[in-house]
């Protein structure tokens, strides 16, 4: 899995603070910008975050380049609707050679027997795909035999408000392992450019009781420590 923060709103925290300040100011935008110091930005962000005034977070957006995730993971990712996605097409991109890039779950690679079962199934899919393409079947139809394990590439843009929501769900221990790893790395990247906005971002247990109720992982203290100590 490879994840890069391709671009983001210039000075995202200042943009959010300016938008929030405007809501309560009678002066013009130019004057607000001149008066908004770095310490003011941090203080104002602290205040609006504590008040739950999250609509202003939508003024900051972040674009990620993601490679080497499975179609199983990308299907979960695109369920987050307040975002923009551009994904490598299996309709227009034809896999060449005897196989296709794929993601192997750790539970599968744990034993030789499981790996053999998995690779046998993957090779059967690859052989069927190649036979169909060689027989003149369009890639858009031959792709029907490709599995969820097939790797994909996708560019994703989300605003800060949606990212916080995304992290709350997908950084949770109960999230599927692949999208959890994706979400944790995305969080690490945005913390590097907007540390105040994303200071408390992560699974729901960081800021209150576990929202999973009876399905809790039971490791809230450990999870909190890991996210508080996250390196950026």
From Swiss-Prot:
Main EC class the enzyme belongs to: transferase
Keyword Methyltransferase belongs to the record: yes
Cofactor(s) recorded in Swiss-Prot or TrEMBL: FAD
Amino-acid positions noted as binding dUMP in the UniProt annotation, renumbered to this chain: 76-79, 87-91, 143, 170
CDD domains xrefs: ThyX
EC number(s) from the headed UniProt entry: 2.1.1.148
ThyX motif, short sequence motif: residues: 79-89
Region forming the signal peptide: none
Record's catalysed reaction(s): dUMP + (6R)-5,10-methylene-5,6,7,8-tetrahydrofolate + NADPH + H(+) = dTMP + (6S)-5,6,7,8-tetrahydrofolate + NADP(+)
Residue numbers annotated as active site: 170
Binding-site residues for FAD, renumbered to this chain: 55, 79-81, 87, 159-161, 165
Taxonomic superkingdom: Bacteria
Function: Catalyzes the reductive methylation of 2'-deoxyuridine-5'-monophosphate (dUMP) to 2'-deoxythymidine-5'-monophosphate (dTMP) while utilizing 5,10-methylenetetrahydrofolate (mTHF) as the methyl donor, and NADPH and FADH(2) as the reductant.
HAMAP family assigned: ThyX (MF_01408)
PANTHER family associated with the record: FLAVIN-DEPENDENT THYMIDYLATE SYNTHASE
Family to which the UniProt record says this protein belongs: Belongs to the thymidylate synthase ThyX family.
Subunit: Homotetramer.
Name of the protein in question: Flavin-dependent thymidylate synthase
Organism: Geobacter sulfurreducens (strain ATCC 51573 / DSM 12127 / PCA)
Gene: thyX
